[in-house]
Curated annotation (Swiss-Prot):
Catalysis: reaction(s): tRNA(Cys) + L-cysteine + ATP = L-cysteinyl-tRNA(Cys) + AMP + diphosphate
Cofactor section: Zn(2+)
Organism domain of life: Bacteria
Location(s) in or outside the cell: Cytoplasm
Record's protein name: Cysteine--tRNA ligase
Keyword Methyltransferase: no
Note on how the cofactor is bound: Binds 1 zinc ion per subunit.
Length: 466
Protein backbone atom coordinates (compact mmCIF):
# COMPACT_ATOMS: atom_id res chain seq x y z
CA UNK A 1 0.00 0.00 0.00
CA UNK A 2 1.23 3.50 -0.83
CA UNK A 3 2.17 6.02 1.84
CA UNK A 4 -0.82 8.24 2.65
CA UNK A 5 -0.04 11.94 3.07
CA UNK A 6 -2.31 14.67 4.41
CA UNK A 7 -2.08 17.35 1.74
CA UNK A 8 -2.83 20.85 3.05
CA UNK A 9 -3.67 21.90 -0.51
CA UNK A 10 -6.57 19.44 -0.88
CA UNK A 11 -7.24 19.18 2.87
CA UNK A 12 -7.34 15.37 2.77
CA UNK A 13 -5.12 12.31 2.85
CA UNK A 14 -3.86 11.18 -0.53
CA UNK A 15 -1.64 8.34 -1.78
CA UNK A 16 1.91 9.63 -2.16
CA UNK A 17 2.92 9.42 -5.83
CA UNK A 18 6.15 11.29 -6.62
CA UNK A 19 6.77 13.06 -9.91
CA UNK A 20 9.54 10.62 -10.74
CA UNK A 21 9.31 7.03 -9.58
CA UNK A 22 11.62 6.32 -6.66
CA UNK A 23 12.71 9.96 -6.25
CA UNK A 24 11.42 12.75 -4.01
CA UNK A 25 12.12 16.48 -4.25
CA UNK A 26 11.47 18.09 -0.87
CA UNK A 27 11.78 21.70 0.31
CA UNK A 28 11.38 22.89 3.90
CA UNK A 29 11.26 26.58 4.79
CA UNK A 30 14.18 27.25 7.10
CA UNK A 31 14.74 29.91 9.77
CA UNK A 32 15.18 33.66 9.64
CA UNK A 33 18.44 33.81 11.57
CA UNK A 34 18.23 36.65 14.09
CA UNK A 35 18.15 34.72 17.37
CA UNK A 36 18.65 31.29 18.91
CA UNK A 37 15.86 28.86 18.08
CA UNK A 38 13.20 28.03 20.64
CA UNK A 39 11.63 24.58 20.86
CA UNK A 40 8.76 25.69 18.61
CA UNK A 41 11.34 26.54 15.92
CA UNK A 42 12.99 23.16 16.53
CA UNK A 43 9.88 21.17 15.68
CA UNK A 44 9.92 21.62 11.86
CA UNK A 45 13.53 20.46 11.38
CA UNK A 46 12.91 17.44 13.62
CA UNK A 47 9.61 16.30 12.07
CA UNK A 48 10.68 16.85 8.46
CA UNK A 49 13.96 15.08 9.18
CA UNK A 50 11.87 12.14 10.42
CA UNK A 51 9.77 12.25 7.23
CA UNK A 52 12.90 12.45 5.09
CA UNK A 53 14.40 9.46 6.93
CA UNK A 54 11.19 7.47 6.54
CA UNK A 55 10.96 8.15 2.81
CA UNK A 56 14.55 6.94 2.45
CA UNK A 57 13.71 3.88 4.57
CA UNK A 58 10.86 3.10 2.16
CA UNK A 59 13.29 3.15 -0.73
CA UNK A 60 13.02 6.69 -2.07
CA UNK A 61 15.99 8.80 -3.09
CA UNK A 62 15.30 12.14 -1.40
CA UNK A 63 16.73 15.46 -2.58
CA UNK A 64 16.22 17.69 0.47
CA UNK A 65 16.61 21.48 0.44
CA UNK A 66 16.11 23.85 3.38
CA UNK A 67 17.02 27.54 3.26
CA UNK A 68 18.39 30.24 5.53
CA UNK A 69 16.86 33.71 5.36
CA UNK A 70 20.05 35.62 6.15
CA UNK A 71 18.88 39.17 5.32
CA UNK A 72 15.62 40.50 6.73
CA UNK A 73 14.11 43.39 8.71
CA UNK A 74 14.49 41.44 11.98
CA UNK A 75 18.16 40.64 11.34
CA UNK A 76 18.85 44.28 10.47
CA UNK A 77 17.08 45.44 13.65
CA UNK A 78 19.09 43.05 15.86
CA UNK A 79 22.35 44.05 14.14
CA UNK A 80 21.57 47.72 14.78
CA UNK A 81 20.71 47.03 18.42
CA UNK A 82 23.98 45.15 18.92
CA UNK A 83 26.04 47.54 16.82
CA UNK A 84 27.20 44.63 14.67
CA UNK A 85 27.44 43.84 10.97
CA UNK A 86 24.25 42.26 9.55
CA UNK A 87 26.15 39.35 8.03
CA UNK A 88 28.07 38.69 11.26
CA UNK A 89 24.76 38.39 13.12
CA UNK A 90 23.29 36.09 10.46
CA UNK A 91 26.38 33.89 10.36
CA UNK A 92 26.45 33.56 14.15
CA UNK A 93 22.87 32.39 14.34
CA UNK A 94 23.25 30.08 11.32
CA UNK A 95 26.08 28.33 13.16
CA UNK A 96 24.00 28.20 16.35
CA UNK A 97 21.08 26.71 14.37
CA UNK A 98 23.35 24.08 12.85
CA UNK A 99 24.74 23.16 16.27
CA UNK A 100 21.28 22.83 17.82
CA UNK A 101 19.75 20.84 14.96
CA UNK A 102 22.80 18.58 14.68
CA UNK A 103 22.52 17.82 18.40
CA UNK A 104 18.83 17.05 17.80
CA UNK A 105 19.77 14.41 15.24
CA UNK A 106 18.74 16.40 12.16
CA UNK A 107 20.62 15.32 9.04
CA UNK A 108 22.32 18.01 6.95
CA UNK A 109 20.23 19.18 4.00
CA UNK A 110 21.54 18.33 0.54
CA UNK A 111 21.46 22.08 -0.09
CA UNK A 112 21.24 24.87 2.52
CA UNK A 113 20.89 27.95 0.28
CA UNK A 114 21.07 31.46 1.68
CA UNK A 115 19.16 34.44 0.33
CA UNK A 116 22.38 36.42 -0.05
CA UNK A 117 23.77 33.68 -2.31
CA UNK A 118 20.65 33.54 -4.49
CA UNK A 119 20.27 37.23 -5.35
CA UNK A 120 20.72 36.93 -9.13
CA UNK A 121 18.08 34.17 -9.32
CA UNK A 122 15.67 36.24 -7.21
CA UNK A 123 16.10 39.30 -9.45
CA UNK A 124 15.65 37.18 -12.61
CA UNK A 125 12.49 35.63 -11.14
CA UNK A 126 10.99 39.07 -10.45
CA UNK A 127 11.93 40.26 -13.95
CA UNK A 128 9.92 37.40 -15.50
CA UNK A 129 6.90 38.21 -13.31
CA UNK A 130 7.19 41.84 -14.39
CA UNK A 131 7.39 40.89 -18.07
CA UNK A 132 4.27 38.72 -17.70
CA UNK A 133 2.34 41.56 -16.07
CA UNK A 134 2.19 40.00 -12.60
CA UNK A 135 4.55 42.55 -11.03
CA UNK A 136 4.88 46.34 -11.10
CA UNK A 137 7.40 48.86 -9.81
CA UNK A 138 6.59 51.89 -7.66
CA UNK A 139 9.39 54.14 -6.45
CA UNK A 140 11.99 51.38 -6.39
CA UNK A 141 9.68 48.86 -4.73
CA UNK A 142 8.23 45.98 -6.78
CA UNK A 143 4.83 44.47 -5.93
CA UNK A 144 2.93 41.35 -7.00
CA UNK A 145 -0.56 41.81 -8.50
CA UNK A 146 -2.37 39.39 -6.22
CA UNK A 147 -5.81 39.52 -7.88
CA UNK A 148 -4.28 38.67 -11.26
CA UNK A 149 -3.63 35.14 -9.95
CA UNK A 150 -7.16 33.72 -10.04
CA UNK A 151 -6.37 30.80 -7.71
CA UNK A 152 -5.03 32.97 -4.89
CA UNK A 153 -6.25 31.60 -1.56
CA UNK A 154 -6.44 27.95 -2.65
CA UNK A 155 -3.94 26.73 -0.03
CA UNK A 156 -5.42 28.60 2.93
CA UNK A 157 -9.01 28.08 1.69
CA UNK A 158 -9.76 31.79 1.58
CA UNK A 159 -11.59 33.74 -1.08
CA UNK A 160 -9.59 36.73 -2.22
CA UNK A 161 -12.63 38.98 -1.67
CA UNK A 162 -12.90 37.80 1.94
CA UNK A 163 -9.31 38.62 2.82
CA UNK A 164 -9.21 41.67 5.07
CA UNK A 165 -7.05 44.44 3.69
CA UNK A 166 -3.92 44.74 5.78
CA UNK A 167 -4.86 41.99 8.25
CA UNK A 168 -1.75 39.96 7.49
CA UNK A 169 -0.30 41.92 4.55
CA UNK A 170 1.29 45.32 5.07
CA UNK A 171 -0.84 48.26 3.87
CA UNK A 172 1.02 50.62 1.52
CA UNK A 173 -0.55 53.51 -0.40
CA UNK A 174 1.85 52.87 -3.27
CA UNK A 175 0.16 49.53 -3.97
CA UNK A 176 -2.43 49.23 -6.74
CA UNK A 177 -4.38 46.94 -4.41
CA UNK A 178 -4.07 46.55 -0.62
CA UNK A 179 -3.64 42.78 -1.12
CA UNK A 180 -0.56 43.15 -3.33
CA UNK A 181 2.65 42.08 -1.60
CA UNK A 182 6.25 43.18 -1.99
CA UNK A 183 8.75 41.33 -4.17
CA UNK A 184 11.58 43.87 -3.94
CA UNK A 185 12.15 46.60 -1.34
CA UNK A 186 13.92 49.83 -2.25
CA UNK A 187 17.03 50.43 -0.15
CA UNK A 188 16.80 52.51 3.00
CA UNK A 189 19.72 54.64 4.05
CA UNK A 190 22.34 52.66 5.93
CA UNK A 191 20.77 49.28 5.17
CA UNK A 192 22.42 46.46 3.24
CA UNK A 193 21.32 46.43 -0.42
CA UNK A 194 21.97 44.97 -3.87
CA UNK A 195 21.89 46.47 -7.36
CA UNK A 196 18.83 45.63 -9.43
CA UNK A 197 16.90 46.89 -12.49
CA UNK A 198 14.72 48.89 -10.04
CA UNK A 199 17.65 50.44 -8.16
CA UNK A 200 19.36 49.34 -4.98
CA UNK A 201 17.29 47.21 -2.62
CA UNK A 202 16.70 43.73 -1.26
CA UNK A 203 14.09 41.02 -1.80
CA UNK A 204 10.81 40.51 0.00
CA UNK A 205 10.47 37.37 2.11
CA UNK A 206 8.16 35.30 -0.09
CA UNK A 207 10.07 35.59 -3.37
CA UNK A 208 13.22 34.17 -1.77
CA UNK A 209 11.79 30.67 -1.30
CA UNK A 210 10.20 30.62 -4.76
CA UNK A 211 13.57 31.42 -6.35
CA UNK A 212 15.46 28.86 -4.25
CA UNK A 213 12.93 26.10 -4.94
CA UNK A 214 13.22 26.72 -8.67
CA UNK A 215 17.03 26.91 -8.59
CA UNK A 216 17.65 23.71 -6.65
CA UNK A 217 14.57 21.55 -7.36
CA UNK A 218 12.89 22.83 -10.52
CA UNK A 219 9.46 24.18 -11.49
CA UNK A 220 7.38 21.54 -9.67
CA UNK A 221 8.43 19.61 -6.58
CA UNK A 222 6.93 16.73 -4.65
CA UNK A 223 6.79 18.07 -1.08
CA UNK A 224 6.87 21.63 0.23
CA UNK A 225 6.76 21.82 4.02
CA UNK A 226 6.90 24.19 6.97
CA UNK A 227 5.15 25.33 10.11
CA UNK A 228 1.39 25.84 10.19
CA UNK A 229 1.94 29.59 10.59
CA UNK A 230 3.57 29.73 7.14
CA UNK A 231 0.48 28.53 5.29
CA UNK A 232 -0.77 32.11 4.94
CA UNK A 233 0.57 34.41 3.72
CA UNK A 234 4.02 32.91 3.05
CA UNK A 235 3.16 29.66 1.27
CA UNK A 236 0.09 31.18 -0.39
CA UNK A 237 2.31 33.90 -1.84
CA UNK A 238 4.96 31.40 -2.90
CA UNK A 239 2.34 29.50 -4.88
CA UNK A 240 1.12 32.69 -6.55
CA UNK A 241 4.62 33.81 -7.56
CA UNK A 242 5.86 30.42 -8.72
CA UNK A 243 2.77 29.33 -10.62
CA UNK A 244 2.47 32.67 -12.40
CA UNK A 245 6.15 32.52 -13.31
CA UNK A 246 6.27 28.90 -14.55
CA UNK A 247 2.65 28.14 -15.44
CA UNK A 248 3.00 24.87 -13.48
CA UNK A 249 1.99 23.66 -9.99
CA UNK A 250 4.66 24.61 -7.47
CA UNK A 251 4.31 21.48 -5.32
CA UNK A 252 2.06 18.44 -5.37
CA UNK A 253 1.97 17.96 -1.59
CA UNK A 254 1.98 20.68 1.06
CA UNK A 255 2.76 19.61 4.64
CA UNK A 256 2.35 21.77 7.74
CA UNK A 257 3.36 20.86 11.29
CA UNK A 258 1.43 21.95 14.37
CA UNK A 259 2.51 24.55 16.92
CA UNK A 260 4.16 24.01 20.27
CA UNK A 261 2.12 25.86 22.86
CA UNK A 262 3.08 27.06 26.31
CA UNK A 263 0.07 27.27 28.63
CA UNK A 264 -2.15 26.71 25.56
CA UNK A 265 -0.70 29.71 23.73
CA UNK A 266 1.51 29.45 20.62
CA UNK A 267 5.19 29.76 21.51
CA UNK A 268 6.62 32.79 19.75
CA UNK A 269 9.47 35.26 20.16
CA UNK A 270 7.06 38.17 19.69
CA UNK A 271 4.93 36.96 22.63
CA UNK A 272 8.03 36.43 24.76
CA UNK A 273 6.89 32.98 25.90
CA UNK A 274 9.77 31.00 24.44
CA UNK A 275 11.86 28.14 25.79
CA UNK A 276 15.19 28.05 23.96
CA UNK A 277 16.13 24.73 22.38
CA UNK A 278 19.73 24.90 23.62
CA UNK A 279 18.50 25.36 27.21
CA UNK A 280 16.30 22.26 26.92
CA UNK A 281 19.17 20.31 25.37
CA UNK A 282 21.39 21.22 28.33
CA UNK A 283 18.70 20.40 30.89
CA UNK A 284 17.18 17.25 29.40
CA UNK A 285 19.41 16.10 26.47
CA UNK A 286 18.81 16.54 22.77
CA UNK A 287 17.65 12.94 22.37
CA UNK A 288 14.88 13.39 24.93
CA UNK A 289 13.71 16.59 23.22
CA UNK A 290 13.61 14.85 19.82
CA UNK A 291 11.76 11.84 21.29
CA UNK A 292 9.29 14.24 22.93
CA UNK A 293 8.60 15.95 19.58
CA UNK A 294 8.07 12.66 17.75
CA UNK A 295 5.75 11.31 20.46
CA UNK A 296 2.97 13.43 18.92
CA UNK A 297 1.71 13.34 15.34
CA UNK A 298 3.50 16.07 13.38
CA UNK A 299 0.25 17.91 12.56
CA UNK A 300 -0.99 17.92 16.15
CA UNK A 301 -0.29 20.82 18.51
CA UNK A 302 1.84 20.04 21.56
CA UNK A 303 1.21 21.79 24.86
CA UNK A 304 4.71 21.89 26.31
CA UNK A 305 5.36 21.18 29.97
CA UNK A 306 8.23 19.84 32.06
CA UNK A 307 5.97 16.96 33.09
CA UNK A 308 5.45 15.88 29.47
CA UNK A 309 9.17 16.18 28.78
CA UNK A 310 9.91 14.09 31.87
CA UNK A 311 7.43 11.49 30.61
CA UNK A 312 9.22 11.39 27.25
CA UNK A 313 12.52 10.91 29.08
CA UNK A 314 11.15 7.95 31.05
CA UNK A 315 9.70 6.46 27.86
CA UNK A 316 13.00 6.73 25.99
CA UNK A 317 14.86 5.22 28.95
CA UNK A 318 12.42 2.26 28.99
CA UNK A 319 13.27 1.52 25.36
CA UNK A 320 17.01 1.98 25.89
CA UNK A 321 16.93 -0.23 28.99
CA UNK A 322 15.17 -2.98 27.04
CA UNK A 323 17.85 -2.85 24.34
CA UNK A 324 20.67 -2.77 26.91
CA UNK A 325 19.21 -5.86 28.58
CA UNK A 326 19.13 -7.66 25.22
CA UNK A 327 22.75 -6.67 24.50
CA UNK A 328 24.00 -7.89 27.88
CA UNK A 329 22.08 -11.18 27.61
CA UNK A 330 23.77 -11.87 24.27
CA UNK A 331 27.05 -12.65 26.04
CA UNK A 332 25.56 -15.55 28.00
CA UNK A 333 23.31 -17.00 25.28
CA UNK A 334 23.85 -19.71 22.69
CA UNK A 335 22.39 -20.71 19.35
CA UNK A 336 19.80 -23.47 19.20
CA UNK A 337 16.88 -24.52 17.03
CA UNK A 338 13.15 -23.92 17.34
CA UNK A 339 13.41 -20.12 17.31
CA UNK A 340 11.38 -19.53 14.13
CA UNK A 341 8.13 -18.57 15.93
CA UNK A 342 9.99 -15.84 17.85
CA UNK A 343 11.77 -14.58 14.73
CA UNK A 344 8.46 -14.42 12.85
CA UNK A 345 6.84 -12.58 15.75
CA UNK A 346 9.65 -10.00 15.81
CA UNK A 347 9.29 -9.44 12.07
CA UNK A 348 5.58 -8.68 12.54
CA UNK A 349 6.56 -5.57 14.51
CA UNK A 350 8.39 -4.23 11.46
CA UNK A 351 5.19 -4.58 9.43
CA UNK A 352 3.16 -2.86 12.15
CA UNK A 353 5.64 0.03 12.32
CA UNK A 354 5.51 0.53 8.55
CA UNK A 355 1.71 0.40 8.58
CA UNK A 356 1.55 3.17 11.20
CA UNK A 357 4.20 5.33 9.54
CA UNK A 358 2.62 4.89 6.11
CA UNK A 359 -0.44 6.64 7.56
CA UNK A 360 0.77 10.24 7.21
CA UNK A 361 4.10 9.63 8.96
CA UNK A 362 2.47 8.87 12.32
CA UNK A 363 5.57 8.77 14.51
CA UNK A 364 3.43 8.69 17.69
CA UNK A 365 1.92 5.36 16.65
CA UNK A 366 5.31 4.19 15.40
CA UNK A 367 6.74 4.80 18.88
CA UNK A 368 3.79 2.88 20.38
CA UNK A 369 4.89 -0.11 18.27
CA UNK A 370 8.40 0.25 19.73
CA UNK A 371 6.97 0.10 23.26
CA UNK A 372 5.09 -3.09 22.31
CA UNK A 373 8.35 -4.48 20.90
CA UNK A 374 10.06 -3.67 24.22
CA UNK A 375 7.32 -5.55 26.12
CA UNK A 376 7.84 -8.54 23.84
CA UNK A 377 11.62 -8.35 24.34
CA UNK A 378 11.21 -8.26 28.13
CA UNK A 379 8.87 -11.26 27.91
CA UNK A 380 11.50 -13.15 25.94
CA UNK A 381 14.21 -12.23 28.44
CA UNK A 382 12.18 -14.06 31.12
CA UNK A 383 12.62 -17.34 29.20
CA UNK A 384 14.91 -19.90 30.84
CA UNK A 385 17.00 -20.17 27.68
CA UNK A 386 17.56 -17.32 25.24
CA UNK A 387 18.85 -17.69 21.69
CA UNK A 388 21.53 -15.42 20.29
CA UNK A 389 19.65 -15.30 16.98
CA UNK A 390 16.44 -14.09 18.63
CA UNK A 391 18.23 -11.55 20.83
CA UNK A 392 20.15 -10.21 17.84
CA UNK A 393 16.92 -10.00 15.84
CA UNK A 394 15.34 -7.87 18.58
CA UNK A 395 18.43 -5.65 18.75
CA UNK A 396 18.63 -5.25 14.97
CA UNK A 397 14.98 -4.23 14.75
CA UNK A 398 15.33 -1.67 17.55
CA UNK A 399 18.37 -0.24 15.74
CA UNK A 400 16.53 -0.20 12.41
CA UNK A 401 13.33 1.46 13.61
CA UNK A 402 15.13 3.80 16.01
CA UNK A 403 17.27 4.89 13.07
CA UNK A 404 14.14 5.75 11.07
CA UNK A 405 13.08 8.07 13.90
CA UNK A 406 16.63 9.38 14.37
CA UNK A 407 16.73 8.12 17.96
CA UNK A 408 19.55 5.97 19.40
CA UNK A 409 18.08 3.07 21.34
CA UNK A 410 21.19 0.89 21.53
CA UNK A 411 23.59 2.66 23.88
CA UNK A 412 26.32 0.04 23.73
CA UNK A 413 28.94 2.71 24.14
CA UNK A 414 29.89 3.27 27.77
CA UNK A 415 28.14 5.95 29.73
CA UNK A 416 30.38 8.90 30.46
CA UNK A 417 31.38 9.36 34.10
CA UNK A 418 29.41 12.65 34.23
CA UNK A 419 26.25 10.87 33.02
CA UNK A 420 26.65 8.19 35.68
CA UNK A 421 27.13 10.80 38.41
CA UNK A 422 24.07 12.70 37.15
CA UNK A 423 21.92 9.55 37.27
CA UNK A 424 23.18 8.69 40.77
CA UNK A 425 22.34 12.21 41.94
CA UNK A 426 18.88 11.88 40.38
CA UNK A 427 18.45 8.54 42.20
CA UNK A 428 19.46 10.15 45.50
CA UNK A 429 16.90 12.91 44.99
CA UNK A 430 14.22 10.34 44.11
CA UNK A 431 14.92 8.41 47.32
CA UNK A 432 14.75 11.60 49.40
CA UNK A 433 11.37 12.32 47.80
CA UNK A 434 10.31 8.71 48.58
CA UNK A 435 9.94 8.05 44.84
CA UNK A 436 11.35 4.54 45.24
CA UNK A 437 10.04 3.36 41.88
CA UNK A 438 12.12 5.99 40.07
CA UNK A 439 15.15 5.17 42.24
CA UNK A 440 14.82 1.49 41.34
CA UNK A 441 14.38 2.32 37.65
CA UNK A 442 17.65 4.28 37.67
CA UNK A 443 19.47 1.44 39.45
CA UNK A 444 18.13 -0.99 36.81
CA UNK A 445 19.14 1.35 34.00
CA UNK A 446 22.69 1.61 35.35
CA UNK A 447 22.83 -2.16 35.92
CA UNK A 448 21.79 -2.73 32.29
CA UNK A 449 24.70 -0.49 31.28
CA UNK A 450 27.09 -2.61 33.37
CA UNK A 451 27.33 -0.08 36.22
CA UNK A 452 27.29 -1.59 39.72
CA UNK A 453 26.10 0.61 42.61
CA UNK A 454 27.10 0.10 46.23
CA UNK A 455 25.27 2.00 48.96
CA UNK A 456 27.68 2.82 51.84
CA UNK A 457 27.42 5.03 54.96
CA UNK A 458 29.63 7.52 53.11
CA UNK A 459 27.31 7.59 50.10
CA UNK A 460 26.92 5.72 46.83
CA UNK A 461 29.96 4.18 45.18
CA UNK A 462 29.93 2.83 41.66
CA UNK A 463 32.12 0.75 39.39
CA UNK A 464 31.97 -0.65 35.92
CA UNK A 465 31.24 -4.37 35.71
CA UNK A 466 33.64 -6.65 33.92
Amino acid sequence: MAIQVFNSLTRKKEPFVPLEEGKVKMYVCGPTVYNYIHIGNARPPIVYDMIRRYLKYRGYEVLFVSNFTDVDDKIIRVANELGEDVFAVANRFIEAYKQDTSALGVLEADHHPRVTETMSEIISFIRVLEEKGYAYEQGGDVYFRTRKFKEYGKLSAQSIDDLLSGARIEVDERKEDPLDFVLWKAAKEGEVSWDSPWGKGRPGWHIECSAMVKKYLGDTIDIHAGGQDLKFPHHENEIAQSECMTGKPMANYWLHNGFINLDNEKMSKSLGNVVLANEMIRQHSAEVLRFFMLSAHYRSPINFSDELLEGAKRGLERLQTAVSSLVHRLQESADFGGTEPWLERIDEFRGRFIEEMDDDFNSANGIAVLFDLAKEANRYLREEQTSKAVLQSFIDLFNELGGVLGVTLNRQEELLDEEIERLIEERNEARKAKNFQRADDIRDQLKAEGIILEDTPQGVRWKRGS
